[in-house]
Amino acid sequence: MSDKIKPSEVSQVLLEQLQGINNSQQFDEVGTVLEVGDGVARIYGLRNAEANELLEFENGTMAIVMNLEEDNVGCVLLGSTEGIKEGMVVKRTKRIASIRVNDNMLGRVINPLGQAIDGKGEIDMTGAFEMPLDRKAPCVIYRQPVKEPLQTGIKSVDSMIPIGRGQRELIIGDRQTGKTAIAVDTIINQKSFYEAGKPVYCIYVAIGQKASTVAALVENLKQHGAMPYTIIVAATAADPAAMQYYAPFAGAAIGEYFRDRGYSALVVYDDLSKQAVAYREVSLILRRPSGREAYPGDVFYLHSRLLERAARINDQQEVAEQMNDLPECMKGHVKGGGSLTALPIIETQAGDVSAYIPTNVISITDGQIYLESDLFNQGFRPAVNVGISVSRVGGSAQIKSMKKVAGTLKIDMAQYRELEAFSKFSSDMDAVTAMTIDRGRKNNQLLIQPQYTPMPVGEQVAIIYCGTHGLMHDVPVEKVRECQETFLDKVRTQHADVIEALASGKIDNSLTAVLEQTMADVAGQYKK
């Protein structure tokens, strides 16, 4: 006991221990669940919660704040209600609902939260950008007019209802009329641009579809080599209504990631009718007042704020960098000249385009492609009704050669439909009417195009020139498509330079002379 403990040593040890204490504390703002059911929960105690903020439940389930009331917060669950009960603790994340995006998502199938659901493992999110799901659309000053075409590879669309990069073009029609087919063919047609090093990145948003339908679509895109530049966002029919509601916003956020970095992107919303139904379901459960057809009053604003995010961004770098509502992570990475094109799809009931949601979306978009079940059943596919289909801004984006050869095609087709209807009542026709009907029938056959066979724009110009100039008047109607294939094979092998020139927008007498001579040689074989 000779060694006495010195007070100075004790104080030194205590001092060292005190200095090593980490006194920083983390405070989480928490609330408790009042009630839960039907994919919605009410939380008490989150006085500072923000609209669209992410909340986290004890069991890891995430939710998004939708209703801010005096004494509670209404939120929609992004998962199952299983395991969530009254009194459970919920904490604020202080993050607005967002999705993490990077190039590793290309070729994958994800849910609206950005999680992979294709069974290929997690996506490497190194260097990912945090893109908000809901974001203000670019103001007028940061946009520029639509002037570059988005080639769909579909003759009837590229010639009569052209789509430009940055446009919103609605695809509308009854169920089973080929709406998705037009969107998928457009995605497949971007393969040549991707291989040429000028990619148009595609985002396909599947809302409320069967999982088997989505799997079949992914398989088709794989077979046609379209997955390397495509991302599929899927909220299937088995997912909660909230996931179906947020799926298009996730697709738009991914599209903005490419758009704001100077690339071109295409987003397909298939379909917004189901999103509106999901929003109606969530709103009614949250006891929001309902309006026409029981949809909430702001269902127009739901679609307008989503579709306004499609834009062509100003080429001037210094202007693009000042873009409104730019996410923090995107600052310093913005490049001008990018575009986001939207192809929303709406399903009508018995061809009624005057219903609430169809009229809303028609008034928001820059034109519509109307598909008719009667035409589809007659074998005219894509079943585009030329009379009420229109593109309000795409005409200025058409290449010169296409604009010149297809300028009268839409009027000619509408005139043919009208005359054909009258011809059923009258057997005797004058020569001009008979010729108009004959040419119309042949043009109808030219515009028929099987699914998954998009056509390069140069070939489209060549064959439409032959149709509009009556170069196939000697060919029987039933042989027109066969004649078309023979003609295109001959032009591809013997006059590839002509196709290339037409694709670049050139058209002159020397080029048309080659087309006329080639068609004369081919049509001669079919002369009656």
Question: What is each of the regions a protein language model found here?
Answer:
Residues 2-17, 23-26, 32-150:
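Acidic-enriched and Gly/Ser
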Residues 13-24, 152-157, 251, 306, ...:
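Phosphate-interacting basic helix/loop segments used at nucleotide- and nucleic-acid interfaces
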Residues 88-90, 97, 101-104, 117-167, ...:
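P-loop NTPase nucleotide-binding/switch module
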Residues 165-216, 271:
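Walker A/P-loop NTP-binding active-site region of P-loop NTPases
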Residues 199-201, 228-231, 262-266, 337-342:
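Loop/turn-to-beta-strand initiation segments
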Residues 200, 210-254, 284-296, 303-308, ...:
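Nucleotide-state-sensitive switch-loop elements of NTP-binding domains
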Residues 243-279, 331-332:
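Phosphate-binding/switch loop-helix module in NTP-utilizing enzymes
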Residues 274, 281-528:
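Conserved catalytic/coupling modules of large nucleotide/cofactor-utilizing molecular machines
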